From Swiss-Prot:
A Gene Ontology cellular-component term: ribosome
Domain of life the protein comes from: Archaea
GN (gene name): rps6e
Listed Pfam families: Ribosomal_S6e (PF01092)
Organism: Methanoculleus marisnigri (strain ATCC 35101 / DSM 1498 / JR1)
InterPro entries in alphabetical order: Ribosomal_eS6, Ribosomal_eS6_arc
Protein's name in the database: Small ribosomal subunit protein eS6
Family per record: Belongs to the eukaryotic ribosomal protein eS6 family.
Keyword Ribonucleoprotein: yes
Keywords recorded for this protein, A-Z: Ribonucleoprotein, Ribosomal protein
Keyword Cytoplasm attributed: no
GO biological process: translation
An annotated Gene Ontology molecular function: structural constituent of ribosome
């Protein structure tokens, strides 16, 4: 089973949280595509809805939303994800990955689309150390 690092952004607070997903939590993402919404219960966030906004594979190659499938391809790009031109009209052949989440993906970018009853900050707050 694949392991993922999920970067979850909360647009209400402007904060991002890192989650290490393994086992069944990671299995809920395999086969999904960029733009799909999943239930937050997969990661343990009751009442939340999460939208997949992007991904990166083990070599740092980004996934493009407009490219179907999980495979890596070399495309001639003029703009968008994977290439930012310096000069007008510049094009370059760059490696990009398709929009499907597979076992080769390491990092998944996601955003909260619907919040639950409990704020995300409470899920990630660390207990304070007792002063001695």
């Amino acid at each position: 089973m694949a392991d993922f690092k999920i970067i979850l952004s909360d647009p209400e607070t402007g904060r991002s949280y890192k989650i290490d997903a393994t086992g069944p939590a990671a299995g809920g993402f395999v086969g999904k595509r960029i733009g799909d919404e999943i239930d937050g219960d997969v990661l343990g966030f009751a009442g939340y809805t999460i939208k997949i906004t992007g991904a990166t594979d083990k070599t740092g190659i980004p996934s493009r939303r407009d490219l179907p499938g999980p495979s890596r391809r070399r495309l001639l790009l003029s703009k968008g994800v994977g290439f930012h031109p310096v000069m007008d009209g510049e094009r370059r052949r760059k490696s990009v990955r398709g929009n499907e989440i597979s076992a080769d993906i390491v990092q998944i970018n996601a955003a909260v689309t619907q919040s639950g009853a409990k704020p995300l900050a409470e899920y990630f707050s660390q207990p304070e150390a007792a002063a001695e």
